[in-house]
């Protein structure tokens, strides 16, 4: 039996809109959007190539998961950076090379999650 607080949390979780940041042609982003649609969750997708992220949003992402999780160190963009740039990832680099950010980035109620797996999303939403 759920108490009133837990019931309230579940209702808020389902009704507050989810924001998904990524690149529209990314297969992992497509899987995440398909998952959300299949579960009838409302979401807003923001392609950060078309709509670069703000400094505040970058800081929210960084504080939510840390740069080690947020930055895609396997990306071609990351490997092309100089050693100095790799050690000093910042907002300016991310706006210059948006594919440095792992995809997708999901934000809801101040919670930040990076990447996608069915298990990860199921645990987050259920």
Name what the model sees in each region.
Residues 1-14:
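Short, Lys/Arg-enriched N-terminal segments with co-localized hydrophobic residues
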Residues 48-126:
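Thiol/selenol-based redox catalytic cores and closely related redox-interacting motifs
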């Amino acid at each position: 039996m759920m108490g009133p607080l837990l019931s309230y949390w579940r209702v808020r979780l389902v009704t507050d809109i989810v924001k998904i940041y990524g690149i529209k042609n990314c297969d992992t982003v497509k899987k995440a959007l398909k998952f959300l649609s299949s579960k009838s969750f409302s979401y807003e997708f923001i392609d950060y190539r078309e709509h670069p992220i703000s400094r505040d949003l970058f800081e929210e992402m960084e504080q939510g998961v840390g740069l080690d999780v947020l930055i895609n160190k396997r990306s071609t963009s990351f490997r092309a950076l100089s050693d100095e740039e790799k050690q000093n990832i910042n907002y300016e680099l991310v706006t210059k090379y948006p594919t440095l950010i792992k995809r997708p980035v999901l934000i809801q109620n101040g919670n930040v999650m990076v990447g996608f797996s069915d298990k990860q999303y199921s645990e987050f939403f259920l």
